[in-house]
Amino acid sequence: VDKQLAEYFRLPDDPRFSFAYSNGDGRTGFFRFANATCFGKISGQAPASSLDQPLPEVALRQANSGEQPFPFNPPDLIDSIRSECYASHTNGAGEKSLPKQIARIGYYAVREILPVTVRRHFQRMYLSGWQDLPFPKWPVDFTIDDLHEQFLRERMLANGVTQMPFIWFWPDAASACAIMTHDVEAAGGKAFCSRLMDIDDAHHIKSSFQVIPEVRYSVEPAFLDSIRTRGFEVNVHDLNHDGSLFKEREEFSRRAVKINRYISEFKALGFRAGAMYRNQDWMSELNLSYDMSVPNVAHLEPQRGGCCTVMPYFIGDIVELPLTMTQDYSLFHIMEDYSIDVWKRQIDLVGGRNGLMTFISHPDYLQDDRAQRVYTDLLAYLDDLRHERNYWIPLPYQAAQWWRDRRAMRLVKSSNGWTIEGPNANRARVAYATIDSPGLRYSLEPTVAQTQPVG
C-alpha cells in the first residue's frame, strides 16, 4: 500500500492497492480533479500556471485491476500540496514579494513599541484581500483529505472491494480530537499564564504553553516548573520571535542549534515558529517529536499557503499537528468578531470529517473581560462536545504520540476477523470505509457493549 494512504488510513497490507504511477509530464501547475483544486504534474494536459487562469478538469482513465487510472502521481500530488509547493504560484504568496518583505522587516523593527491598535491597523493592511483568495478554501480546506478518500475509493472500485478495514483515527473510538495551545508573546502574557491555567482547569481542559526562549522576556526554571507541575505542557516558541527564523537557510541552521538546546533545557517535545512562518523542508534540523507551525489555510497569517488537511501528518519523523482553527488574535483584531461563531463553524466542519481541531489562544490577548468571556465560552462549548460528540481533548504531545503509535500499528487478519497489533493497540479500534457515492462512509466495528456511528 502506498506510503501516504498507509499513514492516513493504516490499511492492511494488500498488493491490490499498490500501483505503478505515471509521473506526469511537462510543467507543474494547477488543475481540478474530483471537485478539488490540485497542484502538480499531469499527463496529457497543460496545467494552469496560476489560479487566475481557467483550471483544466482532469478525469480518471479506464483501467483494469492493478493498473492506475490517475493521469498524475497521487503520492507526489499529496506531497506537493501538503508541503505548500503551490504557494509561490498563487496571488496570495505575497510574503515573497519585495514590498511585503520590506514591510515585514519594518514591522518587526518597531513592533515592541507599537500599541495593539496600531499593530492591528498595520496587519489589516498587510492581510487585505484575504477573503478573495480562492485556494486554499477558507475557513477550512479539506483538499488532502478529499484526495485520500478519492484515491482509496477508486482503488476499491477497481478491485471490486465495497468495504475496507482500517485503523480508526483516534483512540477509544473518539470521533475527533481537539487541542488547546497558548503562545506566550510578551512579559504581560507570561504574567497571565497562571490565571489562564486556572481558566482552563475550570473547564477540565489541559493545554500547552509555547515559550519564547530569548529577548521577549526572561524564562526562569521556576516559571516552566509552574506550568508542568499543574499538568500542562511546555513547548518552545521560535527563538526570539523576530520574524526571521526561516528567512535564509544558513541563519536558520545557526538558530536551530540554539533552539535544540532550549528544547532540551525546557524538556519540550513540541515547537511552533513565530507568526506561523515555516519551511517544511528545513524542519529536520530541529530535534522535535512534533511541530505545530503549519496552518490548514493561512489566509490570515503573514505567510500565505496551508497544508490543506485536518489530520496530523509526518514531516520526516516529525509529527505535524496543523493549525485548523482561527487564532484568537485574528478573530478579535482582524475580523473584529468577539463571538465563538467562526470557531463553531470550523469545529462543525472539522469534527464532521473526524479531524484535528488545533486552537491557538494567547495569554497576551485574553486579559480583557470581553476576550476572556469569548474564550471561556469556547472552553465550555468544547467541554460539552467532549461528552456529546465523544471528542478527545488531550495535551498536544499526547495527540502526537497517538499518531506516532498509530503509524506503528498494523491490522492482522484472524479467524475472528481483524485485530490490531502495536503500541497502544488496546485503545485502537477497527473501522471500515464503505463506498457511498460519491465518497466513502466510515463506521467503527461494533463492540460487545455498543455500536458507535461516526462521521
Where are the predicted features?
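Terminal accessory/targeting
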Residues: 1-210, 214-218, 285-286, 316-455
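Catalytic cores of extracellular degradative/oxidative enzymes
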Residues: 168, 184-280
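Catalytic domains of cell-wall/extracellular-matrix polysaccharide-remodeling enzymes
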Residues: 215-216, 243-323, 333, 340-343, ...
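Short amphipathic alpha-helices and their capping/turn segments at secondary-structure boundaries
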Residues: 221-228, 308-314, 345-349
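Conserved beta-strand positions in the central sheet of alpha/beta enzyme cores
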Residues: 235, 272, 291-292, 358-360
